[in-house]
Amino acid sequence: MAELGQQTVDFSALVGRAAEESFLSFKELVDKSKSTELSDTEKKVSLLKYVAKTQQRMLRLNALAKWCKQVPLINYFQDLGSTLSAHDICFTQAADSLFFMHEGLQQARAPVYDVPSAVEILLTGSYQRLPKCLDDVGMQSSLDEHQQKPALRKLEVLVRSKLLEITLPKEITEVKISKGTVTLSVDGEFKVLVTLGYRGHLSMWRILHLDLLVGERSGPIKLEVTRRHILGDDLERRMSVAENPFTILYAVLHELCVAIVMDTVIRQVRALLQGRWKDAIRFDLISDTGTTPANQEGEADSVSLRTPGMKLFYWSDSDKNSGPFIKIEPGSDLQIKCSHSTFVIDPLTGKEAEFSLDQSCIDVEKLLLKAICCNRYTRLLEIQKELLRNTRICRTPSDVILQALLDEPGIEGDNMVDSKERVEPEVLRVRAYGSSFFTLGINIRTGRFLLQSSKSILTSSILEEFEDALNQGSISAVDAFINLRSKSILHFFAAIGKFLGLEVYEHGFGINKVPKSLLDGSSILTLGFPDCESSHLLLMELEKDFTPLFKLLETQMDGSGKPQSFNDPSNILRAKKIDIGQIRILEDDLNLITSDVVKFVSSFSDAEGINQASGHRQPGLVDEALTEMSGSQLSFSSVVDGVFGLQKVTSALMSIDGHGLVPKNLSAVTGHGKAPMLTSYHSDSLYNRQGPLQSSSYNMLSSPPGKGSAMKKIAISNSDQELSLILSPSLSTGNGVSESGSRLVTESSLSPLPLSQTADLATSSAGPLLRKDQKPRKRSASDLLRLIPSLQVVEGVASPNKRRKTSELVQSELVKSWSPASQTLSTAVSTSTKTIGCSYGNLIAEANKGNAPSSVFVYALLHVVRHSSLSIKHAKLTSQMEALDIQYVEEMGLRDAFSDIWFRLPFAQNDSWQHICLQLGRPGSMCWDVKINDQHFRDLWELQKGSKTTPWGSGVHIANSSDVDSHIRYDPEGVVLSYQSVEADSIKKLVADIQRLSNARMFSLGMRKLLGIKPDEKTEECSANSTMKGSTGGKGSGEPVDRWRAFKIEAVGLTSLWFSFGSGVLARFVVEWESGKDGCTMHVSPDQLWPHTKFLEDFINGAEVESLLDCIRLTAGPLHALAAATRPARASTATGMPVVPATASSRQSNQIQQTQGIIAPSTLAAPNATGQSASATSGNTVASSAPSPLGGGFHGVAMLAAAGRSGPGIVPSSLLPIDVSVVLRGPYWIRIIYRKRFAVDMRCFAGDQVWLQPATPPKGGASIGGSLPCPQFRPFIMEHVAQELNGLEPNLTGSQGATNPNSGNPTVNGVNRVNFSPSSARAAMNRVASVASGSLVVSSGLPVRRTPGTAVPAHVRGELNTAIIGLGDDGGYGGGWVPLVALKKVLRGILKYLGVLWLFAQLPDLLREILGSILKDNEGALLNLDQEQPALRFFVGGYVFAVSVHRVQLLLQVLSVRRFHHQAQQNGSSAAAQEELTQSEIGEICDYFSRRVASEPYDASRVASFITLLTLPISVLREFLKLIAWKKGLSQSQQAGEIAPAQRPRIELCLENHSGTDLDNNCAAKSNIHYDRPHNTVDFALTVVLDPVHIPHINAAGGAAWLPYCVSVRLRYTFGENPSVTFLGMEGSHGGRACWQRVDDWEKCKQRVSRTVEVNGSAAGDLTQGKLKLVADSVQRTLHLCLQGLREGGNNNNNTHQKEFTI
């Protein structure tokens, strides 16, 4: 059975048997299926069984086939198992044998003694029977020094004789014999030290030492000691039996070295794969049978007995299948050979590259880098040869340079492998332009082309696009570099355009829209000029030699102002070629390299080349990107001024041109009687100072024989005649468009052309025809010819058709005008335009070759821009003139640098401003000027220089101009308007500026004519050049002329006029015409006088100067009196500010004043300018912002202390800013509105009185307008007028006197209070004293005392007495006349009267709401209201309160109902008597109402708090009355001098509610005292004004620094059986903590006050003093102590802790 298991079957037979069996079964199945006995189901089942059976058989075969692959391994394991079994049996047998033998060994351990040998040794002393084998292992003594030398000589002789007998291999490079040894060396492999004497035989070689020379960069490879001994023994044995032992030695060691070298190579390649090269390389192993692919881990799939070779592939990304590779393998001669897959050239030798491997220092990466270097050089060399054969790219040898730097490839390799974008050492440099190159390299990792450029000559996206195309092979290198060169030049010009401020249209804007008829090539750049909106475009295309060609296009704009498409050629109005090959270079152009140009060009090319070209070197130039350079676009003028400055223009040329000494040449109408639609481009004005310009349309005319050198060559334009007149578009009668070319001026080119040649000039037209929809107009040319001053000599122009005669006449006049001055001009021009003999086209060609710097392109484009600037300016300005229907003519000439346009504005009247000249300015700049010759502005020019002989006199100065009008300046001949650019509405702005100048001129002359010049100031008489529309039927027309003597002109400017009114400068006015406004703007100082100046401005805009002055004269006095009346009656003393003269030259920066030249209120302050902040100056009611509950709670107290009022804690008796607002309803109609409820109309008339009357409400009632009724208004004002006129002043405090109108030294009292100097005060008093003389009467705002002898005229007093006697009821809307001398006092009384009426109007609603919310109907209510008195009555409990208006105050009367019941009072108890107020308490209530509640400024919250007090029970009310009486007594004692007012804090009951509620929002919440009747509590507040003596020094910034420091203590009084006072809170002013800067100190003070209130509020004290009084006194003392401690603690600098004070 065992034998059956060991039998084998051939696997092929098994497979065959299985296949045969399967086939037979399938055949049998088919046969059965053909029979009809079986059903379909049975057939399917049979087929399924067959499939399953066959599947199982095949699966077994598959498993068996996989198992067969393991048969060699199984056999090997079976052999190992058999061997191990045999070893096991042997070990078992040996163990058994040792077990059975150990007993016998015990018996054999006794020694057997060799007696004979011992006897021999003892007897003879020697042992002859010693075995020979012991001789080899015995110890032998070494030879001494004397024995060694002979032995070595003998051995060396033997070695040499032995070497002569054998043949050494030729591979052995060194054989050295020394001291009996032979050293054999093979370079790069091994080194062996041998000698004779192997195993004692001198005929055989013995190896003493063995070293391997194979190594890496880290050093040679070292063998282990054991391996070296084993290898040496093996070699010795082989050499002992070999015929040629050294052949065997070399063969073995060489094979070993080859194996080590290949292993080292493979190991290094694996390291490169795992290192930085990664997927950039791969390798395959080469065996005997062929190439064996190896996995990237380096493990071979098969084992070969021979050392395999290797293929190292690189640039695998470029070609995955068959990339270039290096083959490293042992050759047939067993030598390591290295070869490259393709032919490559060594850049060092220029021959085919040879590759070898240095076995002593194996470096595969170095070999790889050399191969890559040679391969790159070979590929770039092929591209270089292609480029050198192309003449467009290579014009000079330096255009295409192959750069190869491979001295030490290993050093470069460390940095090159990791850098993907770095330019490699082997690069191909192709010139782009100038010193800028394209660099073509090859990536060291991928083999892909790397395309780079010098700095920023092209964008990275374009370079990447061409780089991908080169790598894909879709484009040849020649085409790529031609396109790159074109794009780089276009990109450079685009960058120059951005640098110059031009607009660059990206990505083929021009290619898509410019018709093909305008283009000759595909490389095109479209540049747009700033502010042109693409209406003018500059096209640039490159020729085959990369020379730029420029074309200037003018496009037709659509209705929306946008350019139309270029696809339709009819939309292109004009196309002009600019040939830079004809632009000559000036001798100093290339030396004018500015720092901006150097910095810009350095960002595109080498800075050294630019510096060398410019003659100097600037190290450290900043390289900026193109986006940075184009971020801040420069304008034309800034760049052109910096590069092409005007310093070359001689002074003679400027003087001749500036004063018009040389007449200008004129252009005539075209030959067929048709004027062009748009003025053609004129290139003669572009290079008049910098150099000549010549275009392709030149006709060169040489001087005729006999004329000599006087007649030089002169360029003739392609127009009909040399001298042609170009009319405005409105004069066009046809559709022809002419284009004038350029004129070449050389040296003496200004010599006149003979008349015989002017008629033979050729004509041509390069522009399209006039649009058909343009409607021509006919007008006589003589009308427009007269607009030009230089054509005034031309007479007799019959019609436009006689142009030849006109031109001949004009030319004859010009020829006559040629004089020696013109020759001087010729010399100057020729000197300044000296050329160097070459053009910019030649220079650009040299720059393309690298012989000129790149800055040449900048100057070339600059000259083209200069060439186009005048044409663009001319076309844009004239088109705007045409749109505005402005007639103009143009004047041009050979000798003039600029072309001038003369025009007349439509609004020009009569012969004013006939000569308005528009100068286009210098080429290259968008600046243009307009000059107006006018005598008025010439006078201002003289006045500006300080001349006192002008018609304005010596007292008038020049007014400063605003920054907006900085473009307008004076000129000796008039005025000049300068503009920096041409915008879409430039002409419209120009017309607006001229209109403003005209209006200002007309107004100034009208004022000067009306006011005249003072006798002491007028130095010469002059007549005005303009007529003013007088005010016919105006007010005061019948008054004498000297009524204007109070007016005085102080300053005059281009668009402004300053004048003052009043002998003491009552008011100053600045009238100016601001830019962007239709009419004028008036500024008044002081600005409180006129709420607005609309009516005054309307007078000026309507040219009604007399009405303006009349309005000012009649309304200034009443408005001044009103401003004085609205000031506080007792203002605090302040230091006066001197009045600055109106001639101050400093410019004000006030935001209210929009322009320069406005006199600020602080500068031109009138006598009454200070302290008028209480009056509202706007036309509408001023709404004040709601103050905060904390900060606003002490504002009234601060105002009180600042104003010096008595009664601390209350609002001062003055008007608030929200009380009064003034509105002008007409020029002479002033409405005074008091708190939106009452309004008084003041109408000004000629004479010395005004009409005052309450404003009558409209039909809808006073709620929508007008005023509430003012009862007894007319008697009130009449009474005040009578008192003032009769010298009765009962209500004024202080001693007041009157001034004698005839006295020359008036007495002034209290001047400092109103803040003006004594001189101005005297002037004000003089104005007051001028009443009797019939002149202007204005109150100065001061109380005036009249002497007893002074009396008002009797008829005036009689009229007033009659008026007072005849007064009756007028419904509250009656008015009366008020003289100006009494107006201020009457207005002040009226405002107080209106305040009382307003406060009375608040009472009914307050009574209804407060009494209704606290009391029942039978406990308190409003009884009756009488609006006519006015008066009202209300009752609270058993008392009736009557409030009535008496003059300017509210009076309160209290009537006790219980006093009429005497019996009840007698029978009543004492308790009932205590519940009734005594007469003194009633008097205290009435006095408190008059003194504190109904006082100024009137506040409804005080009335609401007072009414709330009246609703309290009698006992509680008596507590508050004791507090009020104690406070009143304390104030009286302080006023009497018992205690200084500043010695202790002042405390009072606070009635004001500063919660920010609106005045018109009547509600019970206005009360600051809150009565909770169900709980028997009253919440109230005490205001404490701190003692300023004890307040520490605090640097209080802001507007609250002058306010006193206050503290508000909020308390709650609970009355009943156990009355008590509790502390609710405490707040301080100035941010919430008053003068306590530290939060801890403030909290401590608050706690102390709280404890004080708690102690004193609950303690039972003297009831007769009152609990509230005791609490208030304690709070006052506590705060006083806290303040003293705060001051003492702040003064002690050394003490860090503040002292604590206790009560």
Swiss-Prot record:
<dbReference type="InterPro" id="IPR013947">
    <property type="entry name" value="Mediator_Med14"/>
</dbReference>
<dbReference type="GO" id="GO:0009631">
    <property type="term" value="P:cold acclimation"/>
</dbReference>
<keyword id="KW-0539">Nucleus</keyword>
<dbReference type="GO" id="GO:0045944">
    <property type="term" value="P:positive regulation of transcription by RNA polymerase II"/>
</dbReference>
<keyword id="KW-0804">Transcription</keyword>
<comment type="subunit">
    <text>Component of the Mediator complex. Interacts with CDKE-1, HDA19 and LUG. Interacts with PTAC12/HMR/PAP5 and PIF4.</text>
</comment>
<dbReference type="GO" id="GO:0043565">
    <property type="term" value="F:sequence-specific DNA binding"/>
</dbReference>
<dbReference type="GO" id="GO:0009266">
    <property type="term" value="P:response to temperature stimulus"/>
</dbReference>
<dbReference type="GO" id="GO:0016592">
    <property type="term" value="C:mediator complex"/>
</dbReference>
<keyword id="KW-0238">DNA-binding</keyword>
<dbReference type="GO" id="GO:0140922">
    <property type="term" value="P:positive regulation of thermomorphogenesis"/>
</dbReference>
<feature type="region of interest" description="Disordered">
    <location>
        <begin position="755"/>
        <end position="781"/>
    </location>
</feature>
<comment type="function">
    <text>Component of the Mediator complex, a coactivator involved in the regulated transcription of nearly all RNA polymerase II-dependent genes. Mediator functions as a bridge to convey information from gene-specific regulatory proteins to the basal RNA polymerase II transcription machinery. The Mediator complex, having a compact conformation in its free form, is recruited to promoters by direct interactions with regulatory proteins and serves for the assembly of a functional pre-initiation complex with RNA polymerase II and the general transcription factors.</text>
</comment>
<dbReference type="GO" id="GO:0009738">
    <property type="term" value="P:abscisic acid-activated signaling pathway"/>
</dbReference>
<keyword id="KW-0217">Developmental protein</keyword>
<dbReference type="GO" id="GO:0009627">
    <property type="term" value="P:systemic acquired resistance"/>
</dbReference>
<dbReference type="Pfam" id="PF08638">
    <property type="entry name" value="Med14"/>
</dbReference>
<comment type="similarity">
    <text>Belongs to the Mediator complex subunit 14 family.</text>
</comment>
<dbReference type="GO" id="GO:0003712">
    <property type="term" value="F:transcription coregulator activity"/>
</dbReference>
<keyword id="KW-0346">Stress response</keyword>
<dbReference type="GO" id="GO:0009506">
    <property type="term" value="C:plasmodesma"/>
</dbReference>
<dbReference type="GO" id="GO:0006357">
    <property type="term" value="P:regulation of transcription by RNA polymerase II"/>
</dbReference>
<dbReference type="GO" id="GO:0008284">
    <property type="term" value="P:positive regulation of cell population proliferation"/>
</dbReference>
<protein>
    <recommendedName>
        <fullName>Mediator of RNA polymerase II transcription subunit 14</fullName>
    </recommendedName>
</protein>
<feature type="compositionally biased region" description="Polar residues">
    <location>
        <begin position="755"/>
        <end position="766"/>
    </location>
</feature>
<keyword id="KW-0805">Transcription regulation</keyword>
<keyword id="KW-0010">Activator</keyword>
<dbReference type="InterPro" id="IPR055122">
    <property type="entry name" value="Med14_N"/>
</dbReference>
<dbReference type="GO" id="GO:1905421">
    <property type="term" value="P:regulation of plant organ morphogenesis"/>
</dbReference>
<keyword id="KW-0341">Growth regulation</keyword>
